Amino acid sequence: XLVQPGVLIFCDDPSYNSMSDSTHLFTLHFVXYSENGSDSVYSLQFTSRSDCPAGSNKPWTECDYLSYERRFNERLSTGHKQVYCLLDDVIIPEKAPCLGCPMEVDENSEDLKFPLSVSISKAGALPTMFTRRRPPGWSPLRRKKPISCNATVYMTETEADTKDLNDLCVPDDQNAGYANCNSTVNVA
């Protein structure tokens, strides 16, 4: 019944998000610590919010993370049927939380196919056109979402307005006009 630190879980209970006065759904949930309670109660700490309004029925595939500048530190106690959350003050983390223990995954993994395609399609909305991608190399040990996956993609070389992205890519010696880019895809 007690959730161990380092385990990722969802808190998509509509009653929780409707109680939130932050106006955004909470998305990525990382167990920073846990406490003993009754037989079916545990305590968790949340780290990130999405841009989806609280109380909306928007699917997670259409939500994006808010920037790291404003994030909240939440705690909840949950039983089998109810979720209660208390909002604390805004915190500004020094770095993003770890998403779990990495392990090698099959390039044709069904668990990664849909969330990765959603992430790639969101990236495709950028001025840069992604033409091919290599299979992901690593993913967290947990097979349920949220996931983090490292992938290498080929992309056409970018224009000046995407120079920051271009700095993370290396020109492809064998294919003129293309670049190899290492990317980490986080999906909640």
Swiss-Prot record:
Q: What does this protein do?
A: Inhibits papain and ficin (cysteine proteinases) but not trypsin (a serine proteinase).
**Glycoprotein recorded as keyword:** yes
Disulfide links within the chain: none
Where are the membrane-spanning stretches?
A: none
This entry's Gene Ontology molecular function terms read: cysteine-type endopeptidase inhibitor activity
Recount the PTM note.
Bradykinin is released from kininogen by kallikrein.
Q: Which organism is it from?
A: Anarhichas minor
Q: Can you supply a Gene Ontology BP term from the record?
A: vasodilation
Q: Supply the alphabetized keyword list.
A: Cleavage on pair of basic residues, Glycoprotein, Protease inhibitor, Thiol protease inhibitor, Vasoactive, Vasodilator
Record: glycosylation sites: N36, N150, N182
Stated name of the protein: Kininogen
